[in-house]
UniProtKB/Swiss-Prot annotation:
HAMAP family: BriX
A GO biological-process term: rRNA processing
Entry keyword set: Ribosome biogenesis
Free-text function comment from the UniProt entry: Probably involved in the biogenesis of the ribosome.
Residue ranges constituting the Brix domain according to the UniProt record: 2-191
Manganese in keyword set: no
Organism ancestry: Archaea, Methanobacteriati, Methanobacteriota, Methanomada group, Methanopyri
GO molecular function: rRNA binding
Name used for this protein in its record: Probable Brix domain-containing ribosomal biogenesis protein
Length: 192
């Protein structure tokens, strides 16, 4: 996996900060870059100094996480590669009870019967993060055995949103879960 950094908008609310800390624990080799009063340019420079190649930038609206932007720092100038409009999040403490530090190799997969949109999201995330994408045909155990991984990021459907991104340790859902309503790449857009 490419090294990642995670940051927020300036003066984030507690829930947004908690989501960023959960993402730091869920993504192997990720670091949290404290934004404070710095502008985004200075934050990108600090992320580059820490060795990050990908930046997860979480913005908020009304005290809740609203958007997740994935910026590729390996390109000059850094470019926005993916953007998710969030409809809600479930933190690790809400799913599992406490914060869990996930370590090991990350693999991205989908639900058993994915729609084309979920495949596109999984492939795009896999490309940006530099991790393996394994289409799911059977159970989560089959994906883990095929990829020899410990951490799964599962892209699946949701009745009220376009989809969800959920982190698993082996076959146990530990979170965070991000419910997205809109997904954009540099070339296309998928909306609910």
């Amino acid at each position: 996996m490419r090294p990642a950094a995670i940051t927020t908008s300036q003066r984030p609310a507690r829930r947004t900060r908690s989501l960023c800390r959960d993402l730091e624990c869920a993504l192997p080799d990720a670091t949290y870059v404290l934004r404070g009063t710095k502008n985004l340019r200075d934050t990108v420079l600090e992320a580059l100094e820490s060795g990050a190649e990908v930046l997860f930038y979480v913005t908020e609206a009304k005290g809740n996480p609203a958007r997740l932007h994935v910026i590729d720092l390996g390109e000059i100038p850094p470019r926005l590669r993916l953007s998710f409009w969030l409809g809600g999040v479930k933190l690790q403490r809400e799913l599992f009870g406490n914060r869990v530090d996930l370590s090991g190799d990350l693999v991205i997969t989908t639900s058993k019967r994915p729609v084309s949109g979920h495949m596109k999201v999984a492939e795009s995330l896999s490309e940006v993060l530099g991790v393996e994408f394994v289409p799911r045909a059977g159970s989560l155990e089959d994906v883990l055995e095929e990829a020899l991984a410990d951490v799964l990021l599962v892209v699946e459907g949701h009745p009220r949103h376009l989809g969800t991104l959920t982190f698993y340790r082996r076959t146990e859902k530990v979170g965070p879960s991000l419910f997205y309503r809109d997904f954009r790449t540099k070339d296309e857009r998928m909306k609910l």
